[in-house]
Amino acid sequence: MRLGAAWALLLAAALGLGTRGVRAAVALADFYPFGTKRGDTVTPKQDDGGSGLQPLSVPFPFFGAEHSGLYVNNNGIISFLKEVSQFTPVAFPIAKDRCVVAAFWADVDNRRAGDVYYREATDPAMLNRATEDIRRYFPELPDFSATWVFVATWYRVTFFGGSSSSPVNTFQTVLITDGRFSFTIFNYESILWTTGTHASSGGDTDGLGGIAAQAGFNAGDGHRYFNIPGSRTADMAEVETTTNVGVPGRWAFRIDDAQVRVGGCGHTTSVCLVLRPCLNGGKCIDDCVTGNPSYTCSCLAGFTGRRCHLDVNECASHPCQNGGTCTHGVNSFSCQCPAGFKGPTCESAQSPCDNKVCQNGGQCQAESSSAVCVCQAGYTGATCETDVDECSSDPCQNGGSCVDLVGNYSCICVEPFEGPQCETGSYLVPSPCLSNPCQNGGTCVDADEGYVCECPEGFMGLDCRERILNDCDCRNGGRCLGANTTLCQCPPGFFGLLCEFEVTATPCNMNTQCPDGGYCMEYGGSYLCVCHTDHNISHSLPSPCDSDPCFNGGSCDAHEDSYTCECPRGFHGRHCEKARPHLCSSGPCRNGGTCKEMGDEYRCTCPYRFTGRHCEIGKPDSCASGPCHNGGTCFHYIGKYKCDCPPGFSGRHCEIAPSPCFRSPCMNGGTCEDLGTDFSCYCQPGYTGHRCQAEVDCGHPEEVEHATMRFNGTHVGSVALYTCEPGFSLSALSHIRVCQPQGVWSQPPQCIEVDECRSQPCLHGGSCQDLIADYQCLCSPGYEGVHCELETDECQAQPCRNGGSCRDLPRAFICQCPEGFVGIHCETEVDACASSPCQHGGRCEDGGGAYLCVCPEGFFGYNCETVSDPCFSSPCGSRGYCLASNGSHSCTCKVGYTGKDCTKELLPPTALRVERVEESGVSISWSPPEGTTARQVLDGYAVTYASSDGSSRRTDFVDRSRSSHQLRALAAGRAYNISVFSVKRNTNNKNDISRPAALLTRTRPRPIEDFEVTNISANAISVQWALHRIQHATVSRVRVSILYPEASAVQSTEVDRSVDRLTFGDLLPGRRYTVRLTTLSGPGGAEYPTESLASAPLNVWTRPLPPANLTASRVTATSAHMIWDTPAPGISLEAYVINVTTSQSTKSRYIPNGKLVSYTVRDLMPGRRYQLSVTAVQSTEQGQLHSEPAHLYIITSPRDGTDRRWHHGGHHSRMLRNRPAPVRLPELRLLNDHSAPETPTQSSRFSELVDGRGRVSARFGGLPSRAVTVRSQPTTPVPLKNTEAPEQVHLALQLPKNSSKDTESTPGSCSEDACQNGGTCVPGADAHSCDCRPGFKGRHCELACEKVPRPCTRLFSETKSFPVWEGDICHHVYKKVYKVHQDVCFKERCQSTSLRKPKQETK
């Protein structure tokens, strides 16, 4: 009893709409903060305006799609994709991408009153409030945390047609998201009007009535939407009293999913579940006001009322225009339009095209009160019914036959022609290369006027007959790389300057065994074994890591005077001596949790259904009830569950079935339309079937009576051609049928029997009888013949007398009497001269019924009617030449005249000029003759052009509509005479021409080839180039230009074509210059010389100046101190390179100090002769530039303290005191430097290059190069890998073997003939040496040397250690590795002066 009473009370409360006692509307204090003081932006005060596109910092999900921008529209909505300025709300759903969030879609006019504010917010206070609201209204998302909020507020806005005193509304839209879920909150403070006063809205002066405001959401696809109850009805005035979250005037929705989800409060009794009060598909929403259970219905489009029980009268807004009658339907209406109008709302006036059917794709176009068909290409006629014959213009060239198609044509070409108009191809002409003109293996290439021979190496000339002398000295198959110097590229298996040495067995490939597995290294003709670091190491530079200071497996990293330890996991401290405790060793994580240490703490990663610091708290399994339908897979998600739906299904529990179009059932590009439980496919042209799976097949085209048929297929676009039998003709102009996309052939033609009587062949009243391909004439009485052309001949009786001729007539005759006789039978004679029969002044003499004409000179004939000489009267005048022919004449007009009698003047074109000149073409233009009459006389222009030597004369005809022409296929650099004539074409092919407009011009010559820099010094740059004998035949001169620094001046020089190189002198050192070359043709100004396009510019830097006044201020037994002048002001140097050279090796050091003015060379040997060189280095954007080296020659003091001398590049010596030398380190020798041993050896070499980044390229003898990355002092042997291709010039470093000669001090003595060619013998500690005269080198000065330029590699040294075995002890050998810089150097070519066995050597 009590239960029934409770439900009765609930029902009464629900149906009674009771909200008394509940505070209506949301107070402004409860709105999300807004206004300019909060940082809001205000939309312009504009009717139907808005904010414009506002980019979003966070993508906002809406109806399953993410949006990166939105529009705040004044009319109460936020829209995506496009701005919506429509003021009268259209009933949802609507399409055309109108994605809208509508708090109050109505005709707002903020010009009269109110403002519209908006802003994007991410401040913590706003995010915290949004998070709390969503968790309250959607309790199923307790972990939601807002990351972005957008607030739009319409504050005290009025309606269109209102005033500043009209009612105003205040409402707000709040968008909230965390990047995945998105929500909307609507706040309504006061709603006093619902409608604008525009005619389409129908509101009154108080803003009520008509089509009221609409609130809700629209996806923009025409299907998905949601309306707040009362939308577009008068109930919208009470929207601030309704709610779905227990707060009157507030609504909350989740809008990220495919459908809108309504918020709730979860603490009231559900009226919707018990009563289900909403009808006609309306959605019931619990108001859930505490203590006052109620509901509202969200109605489908077309229904309204508290319970959606009222059908909306769509005719109430009078949608039918122009007097149309509205008929109401369910969620629809229809308009019956008056005469002259059409359309869903009678909005369109009828067009004359409505009843006009244009065929073959023609488009109807209304003109005034009539309709005209605009036809597709290929059709004509009033309704585009006639196919245009595109073959009528004979487009096929060179004998091709034309086939007419619809809107097109096809040419069937005759071999060997091809192309759309058979325009491509030519009849085969014998190749000039058939006679094999090229000798000595040359390759023949066809040219425009003959042939060109491409000669092999060693031959030249037109036919490759001339042999090129070869100065290459490379041996064993080596190839010369330099033009004027010997630089050889050796084949595999050979090496040496001239490839004269063959790679033989080396010490390291003779099965040499090294202790402890170390690898073998070539060493001074013998070998050394590289050792491991676990053996006793003795070297002169101890490392901070030698004491193994790092414990517990730590790795020691040595620095210059310190070290650091890299500790393994679990240890720390300077020497890795401290152990870290393992926090996870006690197993703190329970229930299968995983422990992870993080600094001095640990963290447990718990398995599913467990939580807590140690995974000690269990949670229930939310998937145990099997909530996912339709095969969905349940997985746990943020403490709850989520369904992973199979393809096509959606919804929280996979309860929403997929669209029939989900799996794209339509084939071949068909478009699928969703029909609810079924689908429909709209197929592409040419396909059919329920799923567009079948290709349209028109089938076999039917036969046409009295016609033969051919067709090329049965699919869309196929063509069938019909040809009528003799005696029949086509009923239509087209004989082609086309297979149409509908699967049917177009209408067939008919072969209608030809009515041969249609031409009325029967004469004289005869009747025609039609036959098949023939006819027969039934003649009237008195006529006969095939066409009744013959009558009975009354003239057979010869009724005419006195020579009269009889003419037969139907049933009669007539006599044609000779002159002098008249009468029916010509029986009466008359005066023959009475009619003055004699012409051209002839005299008539009567002769008894006849007459005789006595003709004047120049005329003859019975009546003097014939001119004996048609040119007698000079009909052509002085403007042409008369030509008599068959009694008539024709005029051949002189230049400048035309017309039958040469009476019209033919004027030439004017203002002939050259527009553009290229290598193979010239563009010219001109102006037509002055005067309209002169332009109408001519038919076109003749452009004649020929080379100045008279060869290759050509003439092109140009239509009179054009005033320019492009001359093509011209020879480069050649002068051409060009003439343009006005032309009038005549039927006898004797065209009339005007006087010519002429000019002389010359084409551009070909640009230069092989432009390169050959030498650079501090004040000079040398360049060279090449001219091809044939391609540059027209080049007369070469212009070389150099642009000075800072573009201050340009110097140009012209040289003859026989010159192929040039040197610019007097240049500034260390500056950048730009060099360009062009070719010139023509001997002088009168010959119109032309210039080629410039070659690519070369940017070249001159070398810096070498150090000036290089002097050795002090020389001891083991060192030498050098000084030089400070560089001139304005010169910025980067570094210096110091080279120390003996007769055995060269050592280099790179000093990165451009301000250096002195340097001390140490570690020299007592009593030795040295060459010291200092090179200045300047940095540019193209790399480093090196000056010429400044040289200094010294002799160190012996150990006994005696004085030695030094030379400054000459023979002026100074005496200096030396000091004792320190203990000597193993020395490095640079094998391929300027002072290599005089006799090359075949011992294998160990060489390496360093590029400054720790990458080392190493080479062992003839083996390929290898690369490896090393530290400054490797402590273990480094494996070689990563093969790199080396440059052509390889540098070799040899480690000399320590022997007793290095430690014993046995002075050498000089014999009488120790030094040759004037060299001076110098005794030494170990052996004597020779001080050679300039131009000689070698141990005994036996080599005569000269310098030639060559590409080279500069080296900057760096000392590194390398562990090797010496007996049973592992030492560190210190060697130098080098930074590499490519440069232009000088190579020495040396020739032995011995007469017994001459040989060359290149340094």
UniProtKB/Swiss-Prot annotation:
The GO terms describing molecular function are: calcium ion binding
Q: Which residues are glycosylated?
A: 292, 408, 484, 536, 712, 886, 977, 1015, 1109, 1139, 1298
Q: Name one GO biological process term.
A: cell-matrix adhesion
Q: Which residues are in the NIDO domain?
A: 103-258
Can you cite an annotated GO cellular component? extracellular matrix
Q: Where in the cell is it found?
A: Secreted, Extracellular space, Extracellular matrix
Question: Pfam families, per this entry?
Answer: EGF, fn3, hEGF, NIDO
Q: What is this protein called?
A: Sushi, nidogen and EGF-like domain-containing protein 1
Which species is listed as the source?
Answer: Mus musculus
